[in-house]
Amino acid sequence: AAGLFQFPRV
């Protein structure tokens, strides 16, 4: 699931 990790989790 690359589309899930295109934004950083901070």
Swiss-Prot record:
Keywords: Amidation, Neuropeptide, Secreted. This is Periviscerokinin-1. It comes from Locusta migratoria. GO terms for molecular function: neuropeptide hormone activity. Myotropic peptide; increases the frequency of contraction of the heart and stimulates amplitude and tonus of the foregut. GO terms for biological process: neuropeptide signaling pathway. Belongs to the periviscerokinin family. It comes from the Eukaryota. The modification Valine amide is found at residue 10. Found in the abdominal ganglia and perisympathetic organs. Not detected in the thoracic ganglia, subesophageal ganglion, corpora cardiaca, corpora allata, hypocerebral ganglion or frontal ganglion. GO terms for cellular component: extracellular region. It is found in: Secreted.
